[in-house]
Every structure is written in C-alpha cells, then in structure tokens.
Amino acid sequence: MTDKILVTGADGFVGSHLTEALVRSGYDVRAFVMYNSFNSWGWLDHCANDIKGKFEVFCGDVRDPHGVRQAMKDCNAVLHLASLIAIPYSYHSPDTYIDTNVKGTLNILQAAREFNVSRIIHTSTSEVYGTARFVPITEDHPLQGLSLIHI
C-alpha cells in the first residue's frame, strides 16, 4: 500500500492549505469534505490550478461512521481537522457541535482502529486555553475552554 493521507476538514481554510502542501510534497491525499448539494469543496475550490486533480475528494460527513470508514480505507495516516467553529452558534445549537466535534472525532478514532491506521493527528485551537494566565501561551498552560466547542 502506498502512503495515503486522509485529511478531514479539507474544505476549511487550514485543511485546504494543508491538502495543497501535502500534494506539493508528493503525498497521496484523500480530502474529506462536508457533503453539500452544491458540490462545493469549500476552500479547496480555490486551490492552485496545478494542484487540482492531484488529490482525491471524498464528500461525506464525519458524523456518519459508515462514510468515515469508507473514506479511511487504504489510508495509513489521518490529519483530523473537521470541526464546527463559530462560538455564538454553539450556545444555541450545542447538540450539533457535540455530534460533529465529539462524535465525529470518535468515528475517526474507531475507523482508524478498525483499519489499523498507524498515525492520527488531531488539531485543536488555542481557544482551549481561554484567557491567558501568562504569555506567551505554551502547551503547559492550564486548559480552560470558555465555551462548549473549546472543551
């Protein structure tokens, strides 16, 4: 099996640039994007022309374990960036955030275990540290997320 990397959240700002950088570095990339009826790949729609067509796109939803398993087949590494952002919406729609950010991550981990994926990198946000107690903030800073999406 050739090294294939699954990038979840590839339709987001960071995920799209990561996908582009991985392709430029010679990696075989499967870009997991959120399905939508417009067939839009989010920020990937705007990637450089010389990159388009050099990565595989999988349209799905990390909340669906069946689709996650299908997306992960033949991959040996996962860069998990898929999540919902926008703090104000998390206050009035917390279940949606839990389903995507928590259960979606669980689906990624379970599929990785099933397919013996050897490497998983999960991204987060500096917002998990809350108001800075000291600067610069390091990874040793106490975790004190201020909202549901930052815990």
PLM features per residue range, with description:
Residues 1-149:
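N-terminal Rossmann-like NAD(P)+-binding domain of SDR-like oxidoreductases, especially those catalyzing
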